Each structure stands twice: as C-alpha cells, then as structure tokens.
Amino acid sequence: MKELFLIIGAPGSGKTTDASLIAQADATNITHYSTGDLLRAEVASGSELGKTIDSFISKGNLVPLDVVINTIVCALKAAPTKTIIIDGYPRSVEQMMEFDKVLSEQNEICLKGVIEVRVSEEVAKERVLGRNRGTDDNEEVFYNRMKVYTEPLNEILDFYQKKKLHFIIDGERAIEPIVADMKELIKKIQSI
C-alpha cells in the first residue's frame, strides 16, 4: 500500500523546498509531487486525461475537481516508491472532502499524515517578497495568496485533527533542522 503525506503551508513557508529535499535525499523510497507538475505531466503524456486537462488549461480555465483528483490518484498508484509526498494540497475544503471520499473508496493509497509547515504571516511575506521570482511576488498578490490559503485553513485543520492526521513543523527556522524534523516525523508516523 502507498503511504501518502500531504505538506501544507502558507506561501513562503518552504513546503515545496522541504518536500523536494526530503525526496531527493531518499529517492529510492520517497517520491515528491506537486499538483501543478502532475497536471502538466499528464498533458505532456498525450493521454485522454491529458487532453481533457489541456482543454481547460489552454483556455485559462480551472481544471475541474474530479479531473484533478483523478490525475493525483493515478499518479499516486503509479508512483515508483511506497512513500509519496504532495505539497500544497488540499487548497480548499471542497478539494479536501472530495479527495477524502476518493481515498476512502479504494485500498491502494493510505493517507498517513498532513504536515503543516507553520510560519507567521510576517515571515511568509518577508520570504515571498524577498525571493524576486517574478511579477507574481508583489505585496498585493502575496496578500491575495495568503487569503486563499488562510480562509479554509481552520476547517481543513479541524478535519485532519479529528482524524489524528494533522502534524505541525515550525517553519521559522533554517532549512536543515526543518527538513531533519520532517524526515523524523515521517519515519515516526510510518512506524505507528
């Protein structure tokens, strides 16, 4: 059975970097995906699912929830490792509920933990505005992204806390101790 870990956190929390470093350090045992990468890879594959995804993306439309979840589940089942990390998902209560429903209807993938990389809004803002990645990293866009992240957050955290799947990592430190703590946490959860 595949063991899935979801890594969530504010923009600038370091969740993508953390997940990426963990998977790189143990590539024979851990695979890291981001939802955007999975959708782009499916389009590039030329599959029927990829053509469906492309028909939305090419028009600038959001890919429907069922298509996104189908893409994620197919990738998880086909992953080359037993342990899989996805960062930045779920982003909404609707995504969370639908994903939970789909996972409960199959027996190949087990959600083991939802790890929140917790940072203050000040730290997140400092990191995002300091990284100069492009036009999307301005203050107005940052606050909009924070709003999108924080609006459903309490409901998402409550849901996973009730299932005893929510774990917190302090993201306001240097990357090395964060990654070390996250690796340790994943090992600990897997041994339960």
Swiss-Prot record:
Q: Name one GO molecular function term.
A: ATP binding
Keyword terms of this UniProt record: ATP-binding, Cytoplasm, Kinase, Nucleotide biosynthesis, Nucleotide-binding, Transferase
Identify the enzyme class.
Answer: transferase
| CDD domains assigned to the protein according to its UniProt record, in alphabetical order | ADK (cd01428)
This chain's function reads:
Catalyzes the reversible transfer of the terminal phosphate group between ATP and AMP. Plays an important role in cellular energy homeostasis and in adenine nucleotide metabolism.
**Comment block on domains:** Consists of three domains, a large central CORE domain and two small peripheral domains, NMPbind and LID, which undergo movements during catalysis. The LID domain closes over the site of phosphoryl transfer upon ATP binding. Assembling and dissambling the active center during each catalytic cycle provides an effective means to prevent ATP hydrolysis.
Q: NCBIfam families, from UniProt?
A: PRK00279.2-2
Write the protein's name: Adenylate kinase
Give the organism, scientific name: Campylobacter jejuni (strain RM1221)
Q: Which gene encodes it?
A: adk
